């Protein structure tokens, strides 16, 4: 009994520090993670120059790194109070509204950011995700078409290519989706979850071979599972699609875009 009391005394403060960031449609509470020092360092840097927008963004990014998304939203909002026309602040706050399933607010921020600066990759990419979530697949395809040429690295090129293929497919533009795969804009291979999904779309691997032994993190499982489920869905197999969407949600990787969209898919009749 004494040992149990000691354990509870250690765990309880951690629960208080790790705030509830999101409650799923099933009532599951998802919490932030513990800060390992990045937030403290960012706060210290900001304290030395509290009106420095770059340092405000750095603090919000550090908070996001441990899934403190609601805290990050407050930080970016603080920045917008100082710099109301800063497109990057809208990019980051819109992203975190998306993470916390505040889709209308995410759309507003990302659209405003795009009007302020149309050259920021992260604005178009996350705007595409929001439009996909809202089932505006044509709008999502347009956003990912804008994102793809300005992708900063191979990992982001794979992500943009993947979401563009899914958006075109769901919009009924199957020929354009196939032409995209044939063009291979994601080359060289990034070696991430999106690259693995693209191999499935191209017929290079079977659905049962998409996962590797290394794919164990919650985000990776959520991402791969949604991609496989959507692949089945566009091929007309809604039963298998649903089972993969359920696997995505069960992964617990709640910030993953795949899990966010899986929740939406599972609410459809």
Residue ranges and their predicted role:
Residues 15-54, 58, 65-66, 269:
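N-terminal leader/linker segments that initiate helical-solenoid repeat arrays
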Residues 27, 61, 95, 129, ...:
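Residue-level recognition of tetratricopeptide repeat
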Residues 44-45, 78-79, 112-113, 146-147, ...:
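Canonical positions in the second alpha-helix
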Residues 53-54, 87-88, 121-122, 155-158, ...:
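Helix-start (N-cap) detector for alpha-helical repeat units in TPR-like alpha-solenoids
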Residues 65-66, 99-100, 133-134, 166, ...:
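Register position in tetratricopeptide repeats
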């Amino acid at each position: 009994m004494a040992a149990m009391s000691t354990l509870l005394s250690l765990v309880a403060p951690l629960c208080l520090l790790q705030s509830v960031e999101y409650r799923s449609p099933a009532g599951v509470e998802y919490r932030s993670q513990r800060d390992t020092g990045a937030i403290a360092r960012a706060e210290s840097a900001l304290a030395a120059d509290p009106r420095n927008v770059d340092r405000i963004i750095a603090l919000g990014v550090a908070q996001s790194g441990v899934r403190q998304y609601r805290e990050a939203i407050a930080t970016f909002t603080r920045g917008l109070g100082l710099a109301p026309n800063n497109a990057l602040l809208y990019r980051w706050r819109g992203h975190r509204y998306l993470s916390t399933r505040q889709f209308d607010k995410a759309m507003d921020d990302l659209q405003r950011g795009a009007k302020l600066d149309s050259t920021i990759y992260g604005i178009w990419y996350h705007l595409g995700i929001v439009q996909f979530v809202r089932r505006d697949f044509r709008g999502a395809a347009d956003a990912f078409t804008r994102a793809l040429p300005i992708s900063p690295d191979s990992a982001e090129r794979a992500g943009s290519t993947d979401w563009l293929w899914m958006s075109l497919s769901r919009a009924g533009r199957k020929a354009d989706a196939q032409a995209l795969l044939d063009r291979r804009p994601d080359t060289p291979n990034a070696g991430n979850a999106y690259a693995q999904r693209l191999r499935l779309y191209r017929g290079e691997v079977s659905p049962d071979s998409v996962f590797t032994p290394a794919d164990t993190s919650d985000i990776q499982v959520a991402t791969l599972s949604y991609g496989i489920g959507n692949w089945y869905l566009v091929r007309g197999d809604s039963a298998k699609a649903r089972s993969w969407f359920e696997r995505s949600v069960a992964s617990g990787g709640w910030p993953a875009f795949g899990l966010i969209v899986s929740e939406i898919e599972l609410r459809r009749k």
